[in-house]
């Protein structure tokens, strides 16, 4: 007779579930999808299975994740883009391993994987300035995310070092979504005096800006320099590429 072990019985005997939880803010962004794909590839050759949670910015969901982090559902958890005003649940984990991805809030005792947000935005802005741009727009991400705050910080630092005026009307509050990039771009690119360059805090918003520019027959990069932050697949294959 072939024996198929019971997952439930194994959990009871070992105290482990062989499950890793992955919390992402959304399933509708390329950033989240690439994170999911990367984590799934990472666990594919292990004894672990992946359990996916999406917050949808819901307080109810947050309570579910609190249980998960306390070890009721999974053996370890990866949290992507935890919001700065909601990091209390990160401090609720006791013995369960946890990793925070792109978290720049208050200090936590867990490992963090973050992009070089300040330096990346600083270097990108310096590059736009080196092309001769002075009227540069900047589209932020959600401002209760540390990564958004740091990217704005890098932009401001580069502008100030170059002695360039920071026009508050050219700092747009985006949401890391394509549509938010489109909405801001429609307003900016309809002005009599337009920005000559736009830096977006992620590639998805930059793609939204590019869509609007194409509809208005504004050539990128000949008439508008455009920069994103992420290097997602669509941004690489789009013509022109970001």
Label the predicted regions.
Residues 1-18, 153, 159:
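N-terminal helix-turn-helix DNA-binding module of bacterial transcription factors
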Residues 15-126, 130, 188-190, 194:
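Alpha-helical recognition/docking segments in bacterial nutrient-uptake
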Residues 21, 78, 137-138, 199:
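Conserved beta-strand positions in the central sheet of alpha/beta enzyme cores
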Residues 25-34, 52-61, 103, 113-123, ...:
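Hinge/beta->alpha junction and helix N-cap segments in small-molecule ligand-binding domains
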Residues 43, 158-159, 189, 213:
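Conserved hydrophobic residues forming the short capping helix/wall of the S-adenosyl-L-methionine
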Residues 89-96, 157, 209-218:
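Glycosyltransferases and closely related glycan-assembly transferases
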Residues 134-135, 166-170, 220-226:
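Short acidic capping loops at alpha-helix termini that bridge into adjacent secondary structure
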Residues 184-242:
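Flexible loop/turn connectors
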């Amino acid at each position: 007779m072939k024996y198929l072990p019971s997952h439930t019985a194994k959990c009871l005997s070992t105290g482990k579930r062989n499950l890793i939880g992955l919390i992402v803010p959304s399933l509708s962004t390329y950033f989240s999808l690439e994170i999911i794909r990367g984590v799934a590839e990472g666990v594919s050759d292990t004894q672990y299975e992946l359990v996916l949670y999406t917050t949808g910015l819901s307080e109810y969901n947050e309570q579910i994740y609190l249980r998960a982090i306390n070890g009721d559902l999974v053996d370890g958890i990866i949290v992507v883009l935890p919001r700065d005003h909601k990091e209390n649940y990160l401090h609720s984990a006791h013995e369960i391993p946890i990793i925070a991805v792109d978290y720049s809030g208050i200090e936590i005792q867990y490992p963090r994987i973050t992009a070089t947000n300040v330096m990346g935005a600083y270097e990108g802005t310096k590059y736009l300035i080196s092309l001769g741009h002075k009227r540069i727009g900047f589209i932020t991400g959600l401002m209760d995310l540390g990564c958004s705050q740091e990217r704005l910080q890098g932009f401001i630092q580069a502008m100030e070092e170059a002695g360039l005026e920071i026009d508050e009307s050219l700092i747009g509050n985006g949401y890391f979504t394509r549509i938010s990039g489109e909405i801001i771009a429609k307003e900016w690119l309809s002005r009599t005096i337009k920005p000559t360059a736009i830096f977006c805090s992620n590639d998805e918003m930059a793609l939204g800006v590019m869509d609007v520019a194409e509809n208005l027959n504004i050539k990128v990069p000949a008439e508008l320099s455009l920069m994103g932050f992420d290097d997602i697949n669509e941004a690489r294959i789009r013509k022109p590429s970001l």
